[in-house]
Amino acid sequence: MSQLTTVARPYAKAAFDFALEQGQLDKWQEMLQFSALVAENEDVQHFIHSSSAATQVADTFIAICGDQLDQYGQNFIRVMAENKRLSALPSVFASFNQIRAEYESVKDVFVTSATPLTKAQEDKIAKAMKQKLNSEVRITTSIDASLIAGVIIRYDDVVIDGSSRGQLNRLSQELCL
């Protein structure tokens, strides 16, 4: 996975720089998202890896994407196909999003809760994290019933464990020492 990330970053940076220059960040994000979904398809993956003609791979991939790609998106796909990097498209999309978030000073915050959060709870967490990080935040939520209660908040390399499971684990470790 880290190898794909290393391969993907220059493509993502090039796409981001071009999209920014053209004022088309949203359009490029949509094109890369769609292309990444196509590249993740099992049949498409097999075709990408089994075919040796880069032109044929690029043309077929572009045909599958149809009107989702403009001429610049098609050129991007051709370059990736020539370099046999189409399988890295999901990582390119992820890197593009990361570069865009850094550019827009948006931090991704992942919140895992024992039960679904209400809109008010999400807003409260977002407000607190925005203040703590001194940055705009994008909240992504998930549910893990094994937490028992509470939440775990992750951003960058930081984990804030406010779950009952985490408290019980810490108590258990203290008692066993």
UniProtKB/Swiss-Prot annotation:
Q: Does the keyword Transport apply?
A: yes
> GO: which molecular function terms?
proton-transporting ATP synthase activity, rotational mechanism
Q: Where in the cell is it found?
A: Cell inner membrane
Q: Which GO terms describe its cellular component?
A: plasma membrane; proton-transporting ATP synthase complex
Q: Keyword set for this entry?
A: ATP synthesis, Cell inner membrane, Cell membrane, CF(1), Hydrogen ion transport, Ion transport, Membrane, Transport
Q: Does the keyword Cell inner membrane apply?
A: yes
Q: How does it sit in the membrane?
A: Peripheral membrane protein
The family database entries (Pfam families) matched by this protein are listed as: OSCP (PF00213)
Where is it mostly found? membrane
Q: What domain of life does the UniProt record list for this protein's source? A: Bacteria
- Per its UniProt record, what NCBIfam families does this chain match? ATP_synt_delta (TIGR01145), PRK05758.2-2 (NF004402), PRK05758.2-5 (NF004404)
Family the entry assigns: Belongs to the ATPase delta chain family.
Q: How does it assemble?
A: F-type ATPases have 2 components, F(1) - the catalytic core - and F(0) - the membrane proton channel. F(1) has five subunits: alpha(3), beta(3), gamma(1), delta(1), epsilon(1). F(0) has three main subunits: a(1), b(2) and c(10-14). The alpha and beta chains form an alternating ring which encloses part of the gamma chain. F(1) is attached to F(0) by a central stalk formed by the gamma and epsilon chains, while a peripheral stalk is formed by the delta and b chains.
What HAMAP family would the database entry show? Answer: ATP_synth_delta_bact (MF_01416)
What does the UniProt function comment say about this protein? F(1)F(0) ATP synthase produces ATP from ADP in the presence of a proton or sodium gradient. F-type ATPases consist of two structural domains, F(1) containing the extramembraneous catalytic core and F(0) containing the membrane proton channel, linked together by a central stalk and a peripheral stalk. During catalysis, ATP synthesis in the catalytic domain of F(1) is coupled via a rotary mechanism of the central stalk subunits to proton translocation.
Record protein name field: ATP synthase subunit delta
Give me the gene this protein comes from.
Answer: atpH
